[in-house]
Amino acid sequence: MATKFPKFSQALAQDPTTRRLWFGIATAHDFESHDGMTEERLYQKIFASHFGQLAIIFLWTSGNLFHVAWQGNFEQWVQDPLHIRPIAHAIWDPHFGQAAVEAFTRGGASGPVNISTSGVYQWWYTIGIRTNQELYVGSIFLLVLAGLFLFAGWLHLQPSFQPALSWFKNAESRLNHHLAGLFGVSSLAWTGHLVHVAIPESRGQHVGWDNFLTVLPHPAGLTPFFTGNWAAYAENPDSLSQLFGTGEGSGTAILTFLGGFHPQTQSLWLTDMAHHHLAIAVVFILAGHMYRTIFGIGHSMREILEAQTPPSGRLGAGHKGLYDTVNNSLHFQLGLALASVGTICSLVAQHMYSLPPYAFLAQDFTTQASLYTHHQYIAGFIMCGAFAHGAIFFVRDYDPEANRGNVLARVLDHKEAIISHLSWVSLFLGFHTLGLYVHNDVVQAFGTPEKQILIEPVFAQWIQAAHGKTVYGFDFLLSSATSAPSLAGQSLWLPGWLQGINSDTNSLFLTIGPGDFLVHHAIALGLHTTTLILVKGALDARGSKLMPDKKDFGYSFPCDGPGRGGTCDISAWDAFYLAVFWMLNTIGWVTFYFHWKHLGIWQGNVNQFNESSTYLMGWLRDYLWLNSSQLINGYNPFGMNSLSVWAWMFLFGHLIYATGFMFLISWRGYWQELIETLAWAHERTPLANLVRWRDKPVALSIVQARLVGLTHFSVGYVLTYAAFLIASTSGKFG
């Protein structure tokens, strides 16, 4: 007899209902819960799966390169990056009529195509790629790499190639290798690519496999390096009149500190970026030699942590016990990693537009808006995941004895103070911000806009002035030509930086006013409320006054039956579930703010944002409604245009989002009755009743239905805004 799915759980495999399928899928990756799982086997399976993950990423990036080389217009775009729209790939759709074929035939293509808004064209151009041939080579290389990684994943599941548990628990060696190898050497390699390939290409000198050993990246070669005259590599940088990709106005410097942006491409100087990556490489390669391994020199992580004890003795045991707690909990490690990566992802969103690293990215407005929105949403999901795994750590891995009196135990002991302070901050921000907005709406509605409460963000303006922004007239630090920092930086990076920060055409330190002050505090409300829900979920995951034995019920439970009132909605999973709604809400405000503010900057008129962003109707009418006008006319009784696919996707996103409520608002009894009725009808319908199944159909559990609802809500929400963002931006700027 064939073994039933899931093989990893005998109990589930023998379940006579459809619960077998849904719970099987839900727990397929929860390796800890599988039959016969040992700690060593757990680590080995996760380690092997990392290779599969990387293989998928390489396959995906290979596909991007391949489709652009095959169906894109990269070589044409390179000739005129500002006026030719980059093509992602062709569209073949039997539904297209002649009007659609004409509307979607763009960018010099011979048939319908999708326009790229991911920034890959700008990235490839900046790093020195110029031909389709090079894109194909990159694609094939990544495809081979994906195959190698799949093989490596399989290999590390074979008994003789499975690392031992002690190898996974060797924190110092792993830290050294990740610091020196992953960050250090890869940054050094990237510096090498920029210096040897990208910078020469930006000056009109092609470097390929045929000449890379003979073309010197710098006229003096390695002589300045070995003689200690490193400043030679910064001398004679590209001039302000340099034409990117040509020798006109080019210099010979390879590692500079110019500051600001290349006037033509509006991106950071390539030579500045090479210098940055070299510095990162040096720092991280040094850091990767700091921790003690078999050689007996360097720091011991355990000793560092155990030395961190508060001096007076009245603040507990400090960091004692943390080494083993972190090292023995995969959920703790994953929580830390997700928190870091989520924060970095949000920083990427902020820096991609304010300090654009890729040539001509700053002039491709739809791509800038897409990259910002994409990275902020990804960051939100990742950071929610950090708290989810933090909560699972508290439920499954936390040992009160091993952490007695240390900082972790003290956080749990003080959870009421932590949660109530977050609650107070959220309430304060919410009522005051909403109060200001609503007051402004009322006086607008009653015809006295001069009675609005408009608060200038003076502290933020003062900080901007300290960094060199002169428009506010503070005359302080870098905005004062006679201050010590201004005088110290004159010969280095300061002239370029000051020109950048005071330009009206880029997004470096935007000029801010009362509308910014209000939306900043609205976003602060969202961030603090999301954090409140997540922190409360994690700190109450083991138990609370209401339910002291909560940890015995696991990470996600619906409630403890009808006999124990008030135990619904208090599992750590429920906190994650609720927090995701707040996270989406907050990032909605963040992306609305970014987009509306930038539409004004890109169109050369910031008055609409400044005047309408101080009251709620301004946001609804002058941002959302006004910018959806082109979108909802993508197709109408008079025909269609190239925004029609986004108009349709806008509707489809709403549909997915709305479907979520069907799962969120109804509980399992309703579905069970419906399923039984459908099964009854199925059994009595000719032809249909030839199809039989053994499992008795049962409704999803409450927790599963919430997950399905949350997924629909999230996907629909993001998809709806994606369509709005791309259509409203590309509709204005082409």
Swiss-Prot record:
Disulfide bonds: none annotated. P700 is a chlorophyll a/chlorophyll a' dimer, A0 is one or more chlorophyll a, A1 is one or both phylloquinones and FX is a shared 4Fe-4S iron-sulfur center. One of its GO terms (biological process) is photosynthesis. Phylloquinone binds at residue 671. Its main location: plastid. It comes from the Eukaryota. The PsaA/B heterodimer binds the P700 chlorophyll special pair and subsequent electron acceptors. PSI consists of a core antenna complex that captures photons, and an electron transfer chain that converts photonic excitation into a charge separation. The eukaryotic PSI reaction center is composed of at least 11 subunits. This is Photosystem I P700 chlorophyll a apoprotein A2. It comes from Chlorella vulgaris. The gene is psaB.
